């Protein structure tokens, strides 16, 4: 009768330790290491210590490459998400006081005042220059710090630069505009004033010319444009809300 084979306790402990090492490594590294590789690394019964080191180095290298690729993809996505929108035609600051936005064709915006109503201004002139377009006339106004508005005659090509509040009258071919169409405050831009310096009836005119009136009036630092009435205010006559 054959007696059952009895292994020494240290052999049993060693086998159990090898099995647990295999399971632990396979769970730890997941799909990056097969069970066979885990066995070859952990058991120490099939391969040499040098082979086990090479196996781990190989898997660490592959894991490092995957992590680097993931990091690169995440960084590219972050750059796309945070990159500001590009302007195809960004706004430019015109010479002189105040911004002036340009159209896609590079021309200044002159849409805030009528071009075909024969509207002139009797206000004292700073200068008269010959230019080829109303946009060029606006540029001339912006180049002079005191210019508040201009009158351009499309027939004579004369650009009349003004430094006071507009005083309108009718003249064939005239068009009158502010130094920039970007000044477009209406209604609630300025409010809660006590004493008005001047109230002007600007029926048919835009708020840009109300701004021009304030710039061209001594002591005016604020204005309201409500309906068709432009009201100018001095420094000590208001409480800004």
From Swiss-Prot:
One GO BP annotation here? Answer: proteolysis
List the GO terms this entry assigns under cellular component, sorted alphabetically. cytoplasmic vesicle; extracellular region; microneme
* Pfam families membership: PAN_1 (PF00024), PAN_4 (PF14295)
Give the originating organism: Sarcocystis muris
Mind telling me what this protein is named? Microneme antigen
The record lists the membrane-crossing segments as none
Listed Basic and acidic residues bias regions: 61-83
Q: Give the keywords, sorted.
A: Cell adhesion, Cytoplasmic vesicle, Disulfide bond, Lectin, Repeat, Signal
Predominant location category: cytoplasm
Q: Does the keyword Glycosyltransferase apply?
A: no
In which residues is a carbohydrate bound?
121, 162, 169, 174
> Which parts of this chain are annotated as the region Disordered?
61-92
Any GO molecular function:
carbohydrate binding
State the disulfide connectivity. Answer: 112-181, 137-159, 141-147, 185-189, 210-230, 214-220
Q: How does it assemble?
A: Homodimer or heterodimer of major microneme antigen and microneme antigen.
**PAN domain: residues covered:** 112-181, 185-241
Signal peptide coordinates: 1-34
Please state which protein family the record places this protein in. Answer: Belongs to the microneme antigen family.
Tell me, in a sentence or two, what this protein's role is: Galactose-binding lectin. Plays a role in adhesion to the host cell. Has a potential role in invasion of host cells.
Compartments, record wording = Cytoplasmic vesicle, Secretory vesicle, Microneme
């Amino acid at each position: 009768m054959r007696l059952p084979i009895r292994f020494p306790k240290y052999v049993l402990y060693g086998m159990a330790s090898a099995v647990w090492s295999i399971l632990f490594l396979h769970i730890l590294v997941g799909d990056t290491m097969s069970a066979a590789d885990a066995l070859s690394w952990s058991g120490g019964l099939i391969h040499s210590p040098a082979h086990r080191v090479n196996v781990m180095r190989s898997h660490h290298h592959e894991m490092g490459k995957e992590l680097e690729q993931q990091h690169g993809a995440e960084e590219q996505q972050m750059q796309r998400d945070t990159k500001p929108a590009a302007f195809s035609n960004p706004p430019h600051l015109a010479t002189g006081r105040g911004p002036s936005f340009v159209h896609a064709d590079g021309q200044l915006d002159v849409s805030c005042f009528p071009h075909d109503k024969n509207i002139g201004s009797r206000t004292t002139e700073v200068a008269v220059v010959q230019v080829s377009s109303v946009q060029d006339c606006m540029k001339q106004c912006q180049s002079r710090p005191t210019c508040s508005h201009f009158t351009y005659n499309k027939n004579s090509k004369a650009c009349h630069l003004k430094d006071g509040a507009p005083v309108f009258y009718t003249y064939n071919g005239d068009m009158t505009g502010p130094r920039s169409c970007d000044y477009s405050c209406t209604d609630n831009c300025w409010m809660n004033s006590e004493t008005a310096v001047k109230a002007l009836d600007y029926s048919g005119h835009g708020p840009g010319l109300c701004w021009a009136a304030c710039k061209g009036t001594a002591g005016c630092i604020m204005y309201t444009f409500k309906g068709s009435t432009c009201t100018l205010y001095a420094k000590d006559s208001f409480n800004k809300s």
